[in-house]
Amino acid sequence: MEDSNNEASDDFNNLLNKEIESAKEVKLRKFANRNNNRNENSSKVKDASGFRLRVIQTDGHKTKKTDPDYEVTIDGPLRKIEPYFFTYKTFCKERWRDRKLVDVFVSEFRDREPSYYSKTIAEGKVYLNDEPANLDTIIRDGDLITHKVHRHEPPVTSKPIDIVFEDEDILVIDKPSSIPVHPTGRYRFNTITKMLERQLGYSVHPCNRLDKPTSGLMFLAKTPLGADRMGDQMKAREVTKEYVARVKGEFPIGIVEVDKPVRSVNPKVALNAVCEMSDENAKHAKTVFQRVSYDGQTSIVKCKPLTGRTHQIRVHLQYLGFPIANDPIYSNPDIWGPDLGRGGLQNYDDIVLKLDAIGKTNPAESWIHPHSEGEYLLGRQCEECEAEMYTDPGTNDLDLWLHAFRYESLERNSDTQKPLWSYRTKYPEWALEPHRRYMEMAVKEAGKCGPTKTAFSVGAVLVHGTQVLATGYSRELPGNTHAEQCALIKYSQLHPNCPTIVPMGTVLYTTMEPCSFRLSGNEPCCDRILATQGAIGTVFVGVMEPDTFVKNNTSLNKLESHGVNYIQIPGYEEECTIIAFKGHDNSDDKA
């Protein structure tokens, strides 16, 4: 078994290395040709930022076409677009050549029923090279198809798009769940690129893609230079990616690797699955998982994809038997049965049929949110265009517990040896929610500290799964002890034979950032955490330590460099700081 596992790993590494080398060759060729093509491209039609425009994106004066006016309504958790008219233009794609126009519309544009396209084309409302088409029209290479439609866009979340970083070339954002990256299918103005264009007043171009339901870090280019710089790094695998997921059940402690290939089963219902490399359209894939915490029902899991296949993380988690708990595709018991597709299936025909009904006759469901309201057909049509009308999306449509948390360059600064760049978002609320009760417990512990003129008051809680192992607060034990120190001592006194001080998978909650230096010469709390030999794998803090404690506290970098997850839970900063300064002169001003 070990030999076969090693062979599979070697096969994956060989395939990945070939992919990386190919991407690097493309990057070098692009760089070499950039100056050569500068004069050649000067005659190309471009937008204000220098991006080339396709012919169908321009008007007769070779300037960028403007979008039609549209009205946005914020309705509680939903961002809605009022129906509007839009003229859709596209040139014949290679796969459309020598096919009937009506057949192409039916197979490619699935947001309408076949009868709608037949009727629309028969009435002469679709044009081919500016001439009305009919049901017998055949599409040829170079043909321009024009179709004016009355569009009904599905609502998306009304959560704002937060900007993480911006310079003259790139924009880094925290993408909310439920919003497509760019215009596609039924979506145009309820997309990231169009929303940002409306918000910023200029166009941006995606450097990486996130699925519609996935939230988190996205890179968008403001200039062609930014697009090349970031896009080439992504393709050449010069970037590490870290996602956060909330999955069903108690995920194992330790590192879990999955290197099963992935394939598309049915793009119409967005179904993908694990497979063998011998299967048609199989693509090598590998994801590394590590548990962050377990709350008795679900686990927070750190996910590091080494490849970027569609639904890779979701499919690999399902394969392990720990699907994302609110995943409407891969965690729906009515579709997959009690095992939820663990280990993969031999045949997916029944799954495809059931998924095809989602959003039509049945709303989306998931393991954590069964029988919830969601989008489905209302059974009535628009009076203007006869399009089928839908209900508003629900919980399973608007949020997926999968978040792109951190992207980091693999290249290092030659002087500091730190990554050339590193971006992260705030931790998503759905990943923090199970931990708030323990942080509130730590705050109560901090409140037990007596007032002092110079020392600081902190509370700490050690948790394993749902079991509270020990609590502590500053100076609870003799010797100018810190809260984390007290909790660890109290647990070790009750369990003197534990080889790692606390059980593997223990989580520490502390109201203040653990200290990395003790003026008293006592062992810093950061070092005490590392002394557990990985048993404490995650630290949640209420507030980062201010410089008035110890300047340049390096706990965050030190713990993360040793593989410890370090996460702040927002909402407790003021309370934790007020308690910390209890008894100090002018404590209110310091807080």
Curated annotation (Swiss-Prot):
Residues 433-552 form the CMP/dCMP-type deaminase domain. Keywords: Cytoplasm, Hydrolase, Isomerase, Metal-binding, Riboflavin biosynthesis, RNA-binding, tRNA processing, Zinc. Binds 1 zinc ion. Its cofactor is Zn(2+). One of its GO terms (molecular function) is diaminohydroxyphosphoribosylaminopyrimidine deaminase activity. GO terms for cellular component: cytoplasm. It catalyses: uridine(32) in tRNA = pseudouridine(32) in tRNA; 2,5-diamino-6-hydroxy-4-(5-phosphoribosylamino)-pyrimidine + H2O + H(+) = 5-amino-6-(5-phospho-D-ribosylamino)uracil + NH4(+). It comes from the Eukaryota. This is Bifunctional protein RIB2.
